[in-house]
Amino acid sequence: MGMRMMFTMFLLVVLTTTVVSFNLDRESNHENRRTSNQITRGMWDECCDDPPCRQNNMEHCPAS
């Protein structure tokens, strides 16, 4: 193989690795975001049980 061919193969491998890595990272971020939202909802549930916190954050607590 010549130098050009080796350089082309190197660029192809780097590009492929970057694209695959980017797609996997994007998928994992959605999972992280969903988990983060669940934690946030759990924290609001605790806040909604506390009357002073509920009074200050009524937009996050369902009416009861």
UniProtKB/Swiss-Prot annotation:
Record bears the keyword Disulfide bond: yes
Listed InterPro entries: Conotoxin_a-typ (IPR009958)
Proregion positions: 22-45
Secretion signal, residue range per the UniProt entry: 1-21
Keywords for this protein: Acetylcholine receptor inhibiting toxin, Disulfide bond, Ion channel impairing toxin, Neurotoxin, Postsynaptic neurotoxin, Secreted, Signal, Toxin
Location relative to the cell: Secreted
One term of GO molecular function: acetylcholine receptor inhibitor activity
Any single GO CC term annotated in Swiss-Prot or TrEMBL for this entry: host cell postsynaptic membrane
UniProt similarity note: Belongs to the conotoxin A superfamily.
Primary role: Alpha-conotoxins act on postsynaptic membranes, they bind to the nicotinic acetylcholine receptors (nAChR) and thus inhibit them. Has possibly a distinct nAChR binding mode from other alpha-conotoxins, due to a different three residue motif (lacks the Ser-Xaa-Pro motif).
Record's comment describing the protein's domains: The cysteine framework is I (CC-C-C). Alpha4/7 pattern.
Protein name: Alpha-conotoxin-like Lt1.3
Organism: Conus litteratus
Record lineage: Eukaryota, Metazoa, Spiralia, Lophotrochozoa, Mollusca
